[in-house]
Amino acid sequence: MFRGANAISLDAKGRLAMPSRYRDELVSRCAGQLIVTIDAVDPCLTVYPLPEWELIEAKLRELPSLREETRRLQRLLIGNAVDLELDGNGRFLIPPRLREYAKLDKRAMLVGQLNKFQLWDEDAWNAMAEADLAAIKQPGGLPDELRDLIL
């Protein structure tokens, strides 16, 4: 399980180091093989361990292919998916096209989302986190079924 928000740096080539607290789990679960693609909802990238991504692909394959919404989602997620592998130093390279999409420069946030990560530009993450906190504090900011989850 991946949790927590981690400030990380991208080097001039677009490489970033996976925080050490996740490396062993990623090596044991998927031999360091990852998939990165755009996030279909948020202005960030999503990084999946390969087995998790294969589950997503299986679900996408089962959707009705004649629906425009299905094809649109498949184009966005599968069409932008890139295979990555952690190198010996725990680094991986984000392709330029995906860095541009997420507006990644030197400072980023790798955010654990249980079975995957989101990769955000640091400023965009901070703005989103503030907006999310403000939204849930508003009356009606959380649906009733989610209120029961808050401890």
Swiss-Prot record:
Pfam families: MraZ. One of its GO terms (molecular function) is DNA-binding transcription factor activity. Keywords: Cytoplasm, DNA-binding, Repeat, Transcription, Transcription regulation. It comes from the Bacteria. Its main location: cytoplasm. Residues 5-52, 81-124 form the SpoVT-AbrB domain. It is found in: Cytoplasm, Nucleoid. GO terms for cellular component: cytoplasm; nucleoid. The keyword RNA-binding does not apply. GO terms for biological process: negative regulation of DNA-templated transcription initiation. InterPro entries: MraZ, MraZ_C, MraZ_dom, MraZ_N, MraZ_sf, SpoVT-AbrB_dom, SpoVT-AbrB_sf. Transmembrane segments: none annotated. The keyword Cytoplasm applies. HAMAP family: MraZ. Belongs to the MraZ family. NCBIfam families: division/cell wall cluster transcriptional repressor MraZ. Forms oligomers. This is Transcriptional regulator MraZ. The gene is mraZ.
